[in-house]
Amino acid sequence: MKKTLSETVLCYLKRDDTYLLLFRNKKVKDYNAGKWIGVGGHIENSETPDQAAIREIKEETGYDVHSLTCAGEVLFVNDNYQENMYVYEITDFDGQPIACDEGDLKWIPIKDIDKYPMWEGDKEFLPLLINHAPYFKMQLIYKNKDLIDVLKY
């Protein structure tokens, strides 16, 4: 069976020593339900990853992005689905926050992030993002919702 490939962005807005995370608890049949993740979503046909990141941040948080940095790429592989995700850290933004229809937004101290329920694979790339590692690429292989392998390039 052919795997479906999706291209997405995942964005971590940084303020002082916190990241803005989204607790996925509002959508019906949400694959990410019960997890804390960055904000983001699918890249539209006419968009670059940067454009998608700016749009998704505005839609989900209300913030206006002035500059952004793509920190790396993560390929998620799970059964019949693959997702190529561009990971961003954003420090230059402003505006008034809005309620998100996908979950609850919260500024989480970076030192406490690992205490929140998240995908096991996120724990592989978040330290690279937090520590400003050079541009990273990795592949996270899941079976159902269990991480079974990590390949770093």
Give names to the regions the model predicted.
Residues 33-39, 47-49:
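Short, surface-exposed acidic-centric catalytic microdomains
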Residues 18, 26, 75:
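Short, glycine/serine-rich, charged loops/turns that create anion-binding
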Residues 1-21:
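Conserved N-terminal beta-strand and adjoining loop/helix that marks the start
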Residues 43-66, 75-129, 149-153:
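Unchanged
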Residues 29-34, 82:
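A conserved beta-turn-beta hairpin within the catalytic core of GNAT-like acetyltransferases
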Residues 131-153:
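Charged phosphate-binding loop/patch that engages nucleotide di/tri-phosphates or the phosphate backbone
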